[in-house]
């Protein structure tokens, strides 16, 4: 297999590696969500074909957008869909009432609604509602132009209520009532899986997992915690303990990922400590699987403390011990509710520009397919709304996913129309043929955000070409051609407009986000290095925040790499520097974890002064990123009352900080190996 890959083009090899990673991704709840979506799709086809309900592709799209990873999230989205359906139909009837016989007025009214919806989609937390209203309003206004009878138009519009609401009811029955997937159960499964990984690292030597995966797992646990808080009363009552449990498991999973078990395999003094640590992890795992809080009386003896310090496990032991001794009824910190609207919604011109660009793209597509009298390519207008994203990089990503999904769906529809459809006689045979297509699309759609839209688009394109408004076999290949051409035209129009009209590049945002991540890391460095529970909980919370910030920066970096309107050399230089900052930020974090091990037993006032110097240097570097004026920090340590081991660990932190890229040089230069500055003893 590897020999065959050597002869393939590099982009194709990268694409294959990407799809292999996406298709093999495991996360709690993915298999149940896939099965729920698969069964829901088959039921929708059966119901729509039996009762001759039009717009089958739209009903399938409701399922793919609505069925989420857990019952609470699905219920929340279902409520949004009901609200969106009411707003959609209401806006359509207003358009018809005021401007049915006046195409220009009708287009202007629909354009105003689209403009407002796209603005709210960008500025409001519930952007999904306005996204749905935008699509229906701009497409629904074209019904009077296609049909000469107002009664038929009204009837089709009323059918849209059924088309949108009965899949919503179906997904509530399947996901919320009949086969509920609770967030708390998924959280317990995820925590136990992460503890399994951490415990195995204590005895088995293996290649460390990529840091990006570690950060994604940490973020997944934080998202699940939000759902547990909203859905589970017991979790909410003891939210402080469970939040500490989540951050503790994240810390163990991340730090033990780099633990080298082979380096201490022959050290007999460390073996009892590892066994004790494994038994404590197993006890915590058992309590979590039973949905209970965990209590432990473990106290590290002098021998265990010395062994833990020798192998770099002291901090892990102390943090695990603090969790075992934490009061489950500790009151949680007061939660802050985020605002519904973006703080700069009415001051930032990018929001209204975003809406205007989308409106212009839709109008160009509408005028084009109306002018050439090619109604079949109406998907070009819908594509302009679907691929509209706040920045160029994410828009290009969405365009690629939409094209890929449409291509796969069109190919499957073509093959089915030519080779399968002539042999079908009844609905059972049709469902048997559709089952594998829906299963594959459901598995893709339940993956990560990097590829999930391919599954949704594949099913919608396939349904538009083979199942839409026809309650029997279809042999018209023109439908497949029209849908594919419409999507391609919409992508081309959107790409041109978003690139040359008010392009929203993240090239300026990326250094600011990097500065924010390093600022959060500097805040972590200032946390008192003590064995007190409050200090350790603060440290763990900030540590998760650093993971999230660095992961966000890496995602922005990937999007900036797609912004071809930038100068190639400048773009590559920015991406390389940013990747270097992200990598060194991670290394500084882990180096500081090691320094925390030995620091807790020393005088805190002295350590705080030393930690402040590291934090000051890092914050100074972060402050210059926006202006590209950052140079590797210079740190001077004068204090002498410090242990040799801690001094060596702080030297490693200094070395990692010195390897941060120099943004004042015209090109990225290899990082210097020596620490810049002086460290005086």
Show which residues each predicted segment covers.
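Long, hydrophobic alpha-helical segments that serve as membrane-spanning/inserting helices
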Residues: 1-35, 42, 50, 71, ...
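Alpha-helical transmembrane segments of multi-pass membrane proteins
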Residues: 62-63, 355-360, 365-367, 377-388, ...
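C-terminal functional regions that serve as terminal interaction/effector modules
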Residues: 419-420, 424-431, 435-439, 447-475, ...
């Amino acid at each position: 297999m590897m020999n065959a890959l050597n002869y393939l083009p590099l982009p194709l090899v990268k694409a294959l590696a990407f799809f292999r990673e996406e298709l093999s991704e495991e996360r709690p709840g993915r298999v149940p969500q896939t099965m729920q979506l698969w069964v829901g799709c088959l039921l929708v086809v059966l119901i729509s074909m039996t009762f001759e309900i039009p717009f089958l592709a739209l009903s399938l799209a409701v399922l793919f957008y609505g069925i989420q990873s857990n019952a609470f999230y699905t219920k929340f989205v279902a409520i949004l869909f009901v609200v969106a359906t009411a707003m959609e139909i209401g806006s359509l009837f207003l358009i018809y009432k005021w401007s049915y016989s006046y195409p220009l007025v009708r287009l202007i009214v629909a354009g105003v609604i689209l403009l407002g919806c796209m603005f709210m989609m960008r500025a409001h937390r519930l952007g999904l509602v306005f996204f749905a209203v935008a699509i229906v309003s701009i497409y629904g206004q074209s019904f009077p132009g296609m049909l000469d009878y107002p009664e038929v138009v009204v009837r089709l519009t009323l059918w849209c209520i059924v088309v949108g609401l009965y899949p919503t009811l179906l997904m509530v029955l399947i996901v919320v009532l009949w086969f509920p997937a609770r967030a708390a159960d998924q959280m317990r499964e995820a925590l136990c899986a992460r503890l399994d990984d951490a415990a195995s690292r204590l005895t088995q030597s293996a290649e460390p997992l990529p840091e990006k995966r570690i950060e994604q797992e940490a973020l997944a646990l934080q998202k699940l915690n939000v759902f547990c808080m909203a859905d589970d009363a017991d979790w909410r009552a003891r939210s402080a303990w469970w939040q500490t449990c989540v951050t503790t498991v994240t810390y163990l999973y991340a730090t033990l990922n780099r633990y080298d078990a082979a380096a201490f395999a022959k050290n007999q003094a460390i073996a009892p400590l590892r066994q004790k640590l494994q038994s404590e992890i197993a006890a915590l795992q058992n309590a979590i699987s039973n949905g209970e809080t965990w209590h432990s009386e473990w106290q590290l003896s002098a021998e265990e403390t010395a062994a833990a310090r020798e192998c770099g496990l002291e901090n892990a032991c102390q943090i695990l011990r603090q969790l075992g001794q934490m009061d489950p009824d500790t009151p949680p910190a007061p939660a802050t509710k985020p605002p519904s609207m973006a703080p700069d919604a009415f001051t930032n011109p990018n929001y209204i520009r975003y809406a205007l660009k989308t409106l212009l793209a839709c109008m160009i597509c509408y005028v084009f397919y109306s002018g050439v009298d090619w109604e079949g390519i109406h998907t070009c207008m819908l594509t302009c709304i679907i691929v509209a994203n706040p920045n160029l990089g994410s828009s290009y990503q969405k365009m690629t996913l939409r094209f890929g999904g449409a291509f796969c769906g069109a190919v499957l529809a073509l093959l089915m129309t030519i080779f399968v459809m002539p042999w079908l006689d009844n609905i059972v045979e049709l469902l048997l043929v559709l089952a594998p297509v829906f299963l594959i699309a459901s598995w893709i759609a339940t993956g990560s955000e990097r590829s999930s839209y391919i599954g949704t688009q594949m099913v919608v394109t396939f349904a538009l070409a083979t199942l839409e408004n026809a309650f029997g076999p279809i042999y018209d290949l023109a439908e497949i051609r029209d849908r594919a051409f419409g999507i391609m035209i919409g992508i081309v129009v959107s790409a041109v407009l978003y690139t040359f009209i008010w392009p929203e590049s993240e090239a300026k945002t990326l250094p600011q986000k990097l500065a924010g991540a390093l600022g959060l890391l500097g805040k972590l460095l200032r946390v008192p290095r003590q064995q007190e529970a409050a200090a350790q909980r603060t440290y763990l919370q900030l540590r998760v925040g650093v993971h999230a910030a660095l992961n966000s920066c890496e995602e922005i970096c990937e999007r900036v790499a797609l912004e071809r309107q930038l100068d190639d050399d400048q773009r590559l230089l920015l991406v390389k520097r940013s990747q270097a900052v992200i990598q060194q930020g991670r290394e500084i974090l882990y180096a500081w974890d090691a320094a925390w091990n030995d620091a807790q037993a020393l005088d805190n006032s002295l350590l705080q002064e030393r930690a402040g110097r590291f934090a000051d240097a890092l914050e100074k570097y972060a402050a210059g990123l926006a202006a590209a004026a950052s140079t590797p920090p210079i740190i001077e340590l004068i204090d002498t009352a410090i242990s040799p081991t801690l001094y060596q660990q702080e030297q490693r932190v200094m070395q990692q900080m010195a390897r941060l890229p120099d943004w004042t040089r015209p090109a990225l230069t290899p990082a210097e190996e020596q620490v810049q500055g002086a460290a005086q003893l």
